[in-house]
Amino acid sequence: MTISSLSAGVSARRNSLNNVDFLEISFSKPRRKCTRLPCGLNVRQAVHVVRLLATCRRDLRRRTLAYAIPNENDEAKKAASHDCNLDTMALHLDNNASSKYSDVEVVASISCLEDDISQSIENLKSQGSILDKLKAVHLHLLASERWNASRLKLCHRHYSDSARNLIHYLALRCLDLEQLKEDLSCTSLLNLESINSYILASLTAGIQLLDNQKSSSLNTQESILYQEENGNFMIQALGKKLSANKELLLGPLRHNQTNHIMVTVGQEASESEISDILKAGASIIRINCAHGNPSIWSEIIRRVKTSSQMLEMPCQILMDLAGPKLRTGNLKPGPCIIKISPKKNATGNVILPSQVWLSHKDAGPPPSHLSPDAVLFIDDKKFLSELQVGHILKFSDARGKKRMLKISRQFHFFSGTGFVAECSRTAYVQSGTELHRKGKKIRFPAAQVVDVPAVEPFIRLRVGDLLTISRDSSCEQDESSEPISSAHRITCSSSCLFDSVKPGEPIAFDDGKIWGLIQGASISEIVVSITHAGPRGTKLGSGKSINIPKSNIHFEGLTTKDLMDLEFVASHADMVGISFVRDSCDIAMLRKELEKRKVQNLGVVLKIETKSGFERLPHILLEAMKSSNPLGVMIARGDLAVECGWERLADMQEEILSICGAAHVPVIWATQVLESLVKFGVPTRAEITDVASARRSVRTSWPVAFRLKIDEATSASEILRASCVMLNKGKHVVEAVSTLDKILHINTAQMKADLMKPLLPSSHFF
């Protein structure tokens, strides 16, 4: 129904200001927001209305004061006003029955209505049916709780309320509530989409408010308000549960921060780089146990703790167990050589010489604010101590070509001295290359380049190529030079892969960068036809992920390596990440191992990265709640997207966030966050908006009587969806952490207010 033109004016006399607080205009379109106008203002503005409501201080109930309908001649006519309460008490404001509210004058006119407005008014007075529906839903939730009573009793007392709320959430999701949501939205009573953290208490509050409207007795009303205060206490407690669990798992937030930043580091991260990462805003460091060994992990942890203590910035450590992940085997390493190449223009002329860092092998990597094109370590400290800016070093590269390095800058730092040298021609430098300092008559002693890393081996796959995956490591392909044929070979040591796949099933590599179709399979080899790769081919190296989303694969929960690594993690880390969680059996096995090691305070982060893990998440959480260990969930979007499909990732991510919100479990949002910025120094537009969704909030919709206390419980009624955002390691990770910190903690309310100021001609609307 639409109203082409309706003018309504309401003027309140001065003697009515002590009674009437607000006038509310309800629009003909149910989805339109109601406009509340302070009394004492004369409104002469054309609006599309169906009814006018007034709220009085002496009575919390809202009543319909007037509405207008057309007569046969399409002339405006004031109709009898109806109370909006469930008892449908009428307040007639015609000429004969207006003495009680004589201080309110209503003027209304209407020109055209397409449908009969009376039907719309009847729809607006549907609170009785809403109350019945809410009570039915309330009973359904209680029945579900009783049905799962035996399961809830097994949960640790710390998680008992959270487990109950999770059961209520699941019971609510089983119902078709679209019509009820629509009705609640029209009445501005409750938003079922934003009550995940305190479902039963929210429904109780809504029911109490509707029951309150049915009663006109002051004593009854006071009794109900007392009950509401008790209900608010329950809402407050549940509202603070997520914040408490977040601090228990991730540690306290720094000043002015709203959520944590986690950064993955490897053995290449120096102490100075870790310090820069912490200063930029990171509060959690992640170590991936799939790479390295206990000695490497110990050194990383030492650097982290040293930096944290020096900066007086608390930092938690998360160690991810490798889990039963399928990965490509090792290719034969390439030569220990590095290419130094200056930047050239389209015609091949050098426009910028290559920047090379020179230092002693024990000095560590260059300072984080430098981004050299190559790093060369020298074995002779005396040779370095005699170098000065302007000196020239001559050498013969791996091809026998004569090349030179010119020292342009010198740096002194706590671990030694380093230099930046410029090279104007392409050179290939290998371990053992001799550097000679150029002199007019004196021949200076030479120094050798050492510890040049081996070239990372890879195979380049194109669409149509055949790839053979072998179980036998002796079948490794030597990739020192790319083969001319389209047949490639790589290994995988996991027997699960060869026992699970069948011809015709898809297979993905490196987080979905390469896709193929299995042509044949045996107990020792799998032949794959590549169906998706980059236009110029895509590199596939050692240790890259393998996913078989359509195959029926059976993994063990914790591998033998995981159990060995857990010994180290339990004594050195604050949190342990459990990779590729598939069902509650994996969690039961983990709980036994943690009980065996008596580590009740070790945080447990469940990584959801498989289809079965997503589908069984509620059961997994309830199983994890049987222990007292701090609990969290990581959304590993890389494997999850490959396993379940790119088109489903956004919806699955939202569902995980909703389930964890109902269980009061903090969420870590991970994989490819600001990846372009981390790797190349420049973010994409999509990455920036992607990160912004991590701080997206759900604004709860509540009755006025309850809103204040709920706001106190949920920090101005905003619930952060992700408690922590994770960045992977990369060349520009410090800059990425700083950018992420600014995006996550920007004052959006102040920013929106500043944006609106030029659009507002005056601070007075009327």
Each predicted region: which residue ranges?
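Non-catalytic helical/linker scaffolds that mediate oligomerization, partner binding
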Residues: T2-A12, D21-E24, K29, G40, ...
